[in-house]
């Protein structure tokens, strides 16, 4: 049994708290708001993000980071990617010295173009071999409902990856290990942008041929970027690559796909945000940082560039489609 701290009580953080508790660990969950922590402790549910889904009574929620982090063997960071650094700067003195730090945030930091593992290493002042990434086709609601799913735990220290794997192995949740942190992170961050494109296409009423084209060519550009940054190309054919991409691009539970769908129907960014409970999809933010990261790495990412144009440069979805279909002919 491990002591696990989950820092962030959103839908995915809460779901993973349940997973680790169901796997037999001692789990503490940090929530920003007192009323949410109280609901988790007394009613054993998260009414804001996972209403009516029962949580294990063993999960102890707190608004005090020190309480949540005390004696933790595994610390899971579940806050939005663009807030991770600011939170870590406050939490760093509280982190247990030998704990494995696990990122479940999927994005690229706008200010630095750093991956989340790099943000953790920098802001917390820890060595990279203590940092792991959990990524895969893991829609929070389905996992919380105990529908069978698998994921990848990536860490350069194989022993740490295996320790997290063992701790996360609930009856309905099967973790695999991997040492390719960069590949897992690039796959997780970029798939949100491709899911926006799939949502836009669905909003325009386009069919399966279009979706399959976006997913397949999206995977190609994700792989190009990942390999240029040092990732193993085989990672992108696995759970953290193709698996995560298919789930996020296909499911109506995907916030990024839903957001893109609203844009495809002619909605503005503001209207799409309102339709997703006031939350901007991660892919909207990531399209900017990933597009700039691709430019810096001199990697062509046409779908990402097209989504960036819609989200940040006022390009219409119709014009985006015309531009993508009119690109110079090339070999696959």
UniProtKB/Swiss-Prot annotation:
Domain of life: Bacteria
KW Protein biosynthesis (keyword) present: no
Keyword field: Cytoplasm, Lipid biosynthesis, Lipid metabolism, NAD, NADP, Nucleotide-binding, Oxidoreductase, Phospholipid biosynthesis, Phospholipid metabolism
Pathway it works in: Membrane lipid metabolism; glycerophospholipid metabolism
PROSITE patterns: NAD_G3PDH
Binding positions (sn-glycerol 3-phosphate): 106, 136, 191, 244, 254-256
Enzyme Commission designation: 1.1.1.94
Binding site for NADPH: 11-12, 32-33, 106, 140, 255, 280, 282
Reaction catalysis annotation: sn-glycerol 3-phosphate + NAD(+) = dihydroxyacetone phosphate + NADH + H(+); sn-glycerol 3-phosphate + NADP(+) = dihydroxyacetone phosphate + NADPH + H(+)
Residues annotated as catalytic: 191
Gene Ontology terms describing biological process: carbohydrate metabolic process; glycerol-3-phosphate biosynthetic process; glycerol-3-phosphate catabolic process; glycerophospholipid metabolic process; phospholipid biosynthetic process
Annotated coiled-coil segments of the chain: none
GO cellular component, one term: cytosol
GO molecular function: glycerol-3-phosphate dehydrogenase [NAD(P)+] activity; NAD binding
Subcellular locations according to the entry: Cytoplasm
Classification via NCBIfam families: PRK00094.1-2, PRK00094.1-4
Function: Catalyzes the reduction of the glycolytic intermediate dihydroxyacetone phosphate (DHAP) to sn-glycerol 3-phosphate (G3P), the key precursor for phospholipid synthesis.
Record-linked HAMAP family: NAD_Glyc3P_dehydrog (MF_00394)
Family statement: Belongs to the NAD-dependent glycerol-3-phosphate dehydrogenase family.
Protein name (record): Glycerol-3-phosphate dehydrogenase [NAD(P)+]
